[in-house]
Design a protein with these regions (language model features):
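A short beta-loop-alpha structural element at the N-terminal edge
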Residues: 2-15
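Conserved beta-strand in the GNAT
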Residues: 45, 51-62, 73-78
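Short hydrophobic/aromatic beta-strand element in the GNAT-like acyltransferase core
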Residues: 29-30, 41-45, 55, 76, ...
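Conserved GNAT acetyl-CoA-binding A-motif
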Residues: 93, 100-113
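Conserved acetyl-CoA-binding loop of GNAT-fold acetyltransferases
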Residues: 121-130
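C-terminal "cap" of GNAT-fold acetyltransferases
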Residues: 113-114, 133-147
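Conserved acetyl-CoA binding element of GNAT-fold acetyltransferases
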Residues: 68-81, 141
Length: 147
């Protein structure tokens, strides 16, 4: 079993993994999110012994489709292709939820890509059945979870 460790990082540390996994190696300027640099934002990186292999950002944002009180948006969840299906994504999400609980955040929500839908449903996220296309990226579902 590969050793993976998780830690809070600054948003710039996630740009390379976001670019590679989520944006087809796009320029980093296309890999930044509104709220990345807010003091309330939380960024988590997953590392093997030498490099970042995954990550996620938690950004204080009102829910876009359903009224959720005291919520954060889960953004930029990614794991390098060669490390997928090894439980790393689940570890990242579990750690993200713990970070939210420590801050007494009640709900997490996200715009989930179709190919990631089963992953989130296994982690007890609720599919609102609201679907929409994000230009240049594809069809997404609005998911949420009370934590």
């Amino acid at each position: 079993m590969m050793k993976v460790f998780l830690k809070k990082v600054n948003p710039d540390q996630l740009l390379s993994i976001r670019s590679k996994v989520l944006r087809n190696n796009s320029d980093f300027k296309f890999c930044r999110y509104d709220g990345d640099n807010a003091n309330s934002s939380i960024h988590i990186g997953a590392f093997n012994s030498k490099e970042i292999i995954g990550g996620v950002s938690l950004i204080k944002n009102d829910s876009t489709h359903i009224v959720l009180k005291n919520c954060y948006q889960l953004r930029g969840m990614c794991v390098n292709d060669e490390y997928q299906k090894k439980g790393i994504g689940k570890k990242i999400i579990n750690y993200a939820e713990i970070c939210c609980k420590e801050l007494q955040i009640s709900n997490l929500w996200m715009n989930a890509r179709i190919k990631a839908l089963k992953f989130y449903l296994k982690l007890n996220y609720i599919d609102s059945e609201i679907k929409y296309d994000i230009k240049g990226i594809g069809l997404h579902h609005f998911l949420y979870k009370k934590i």
